[in-house]
Curated annotation (Swiss-Prot):
Induction: Part of the rimO-crhR operon; upon a cold shift from 30 to 20 degrees Celsius, expression increases to a peak at 20 minutes, then decreases. In a crhR deletion, mRNA rises to high level and remains high for at least 2 hours; de novo transcription is wild-type, suggesting CrhR is involved in wild-type regulation of mRNA levels. The rimO-crhR transcript is processed between the 2 genes by RNase E (rne). HAMAP family: MTTase_RimO (MF_01865). It catalyses: L-aspartate(89)-[ribosomal protein uS12]-hydrogen + (sulfur carrier)-SH + AH2 + 2 S-adenosyl-L-methionine = 3-methylsulfanyl-L-aspartate(89)-[ribosomal protein uS12]-hydrogen + (sulfur carrier)-H + 5'-deoxyadenosine + L-methionine + A + S-adenosyl-L-homocysteine + 2 H(+). Its EC number is 2.8.4.4. This is Ribosomal protein uS12 methylthiotransferase RimO. It comes from the Bacteria. Pfam families: Radical_SAM, TRAM_2, UPF0004. Residues 372-438 form the TRAM domain. One of its GO terms (molecular function) is N6-isopentenyladenosine methylthiotransferase activity. Residues 5-116 form the MTTase N-terminal domain. It is found in: Cytoplasm. GO terms for cellular component: cytosol. It comes from Synechocystis sp. (strain ATCC 27184 / PCC 6803 / Kazusa).
Amino acid sequence: MGQTPTIAINHLGCEKNRIDSEHMLGLLVEAGYQVDANEELADYVIVNTCSFIQDARQESVRTLVELAEAKKKIVISGCLAQHFQEQLLEEIPEAVAVVGTGDYQNIVDIIRRTEQGQRVKAISPNPSFIADENLPRYRTTNEAIAYLRVAEGCDYRCAFCIIPQLRGKQRSRPIESIVAEAEQLASQGVKELILISQITTNYGLDLYGEPKLAELLQALGKVDIPWIRIHYAYPTGLTPKVIEAIRDTPNVLPYLDLPLQHSHPDILRAMNRPWQGQVNDDIITRLKTALPDAVLRTTFIVGFPGETEEHFGHLLDFVQRHQFDHVGVFTFSPEEGTAAFDLPNAVPEEVMGDRRDRLMALQQPISAQKNAACLGQTLDVLIEQENPSTGEFIGRSTRFAPEVDGLVYVKGNANLNEIVPVVITATDDYDLYGMTAEEAKVF
């Protein structure tokens, strides 16, 4: 074989997909392939696709079409490949391979087979693989941040969600494996570790016979990483034991990402989340009592089939009452293969859009008020970027998760990828502004 081809990866979708991309990069680099961020210079482009909702599929398809027009050899991986492998091979001649969500660990063999002229379909119908600390990984986040997958797949069957069909049943990693990877990441200079899975509060249920998130957090408390953040916590899994572990483990942030989806029992029942409607209020109250400094992020779906103005009004009241720090709102997207796909009483697009806008308009002053409460405080900020034209630094406090929440704009001297104390001097609806505590002493 002559010179090895150059390969680029285009990552789309969620952070679970990002980790898959990082493992593929790590495997390819270890095998001697050249990796380039510039797709124009690459011989192959791996597009790690998303198929969660219609907008994500459209973005994936647009990317594939653009690369096909550029005559690139395309390897399609991820959820779209798992979902529509036959259609993709039929409609995109430039696709030399499709790779399922449980097959990315074989990427080196797949590329070698395509180099020999084969067109490869590597799709496990029931994905069962989960990467551990021994699989090479080439991180694509900045030096100080890493995502750590504690489990893959999902055993729940929410009516709107296709993910269990695309990523398989839940399979958790042993606590020892997760801690070993966290230690590796700490040695690489990681300052913030974000724990992810489909339902992080269910971690360990398949492996140990009961959820073990509390024990995992306690074990990670011994790792030298200052910030550990939990994403995708199912509300009913926030038991007193888990809340206690969050409270008592110093490097676990009191930040919780809770995908509540709705508040009204009728809609939650239709979503196949019936038990949640009985406990939403109690769990949030219990959280705020046990963790007074807790930062709560949530997401909601508006326009689920059958959602009336009364149901939506219940959601508005719920958001007003609980004063979440951060809220994301999605309009319902009917996904073929899910229980909600052909439900009656569809909500018109314009009504869904109006409800999304009304909910975000309700949340905006709440977010602004939460930020305003930080005025005059000194907050720890992880410095991530520098604006060379202004000399200003950009980072995040513990209140803000990467990419989904706000930023902190910082004046003064600081080092990238370090956590520094910052005095907050101004706020707006979504961001904070300040100067390093050292700079503030000058004034």
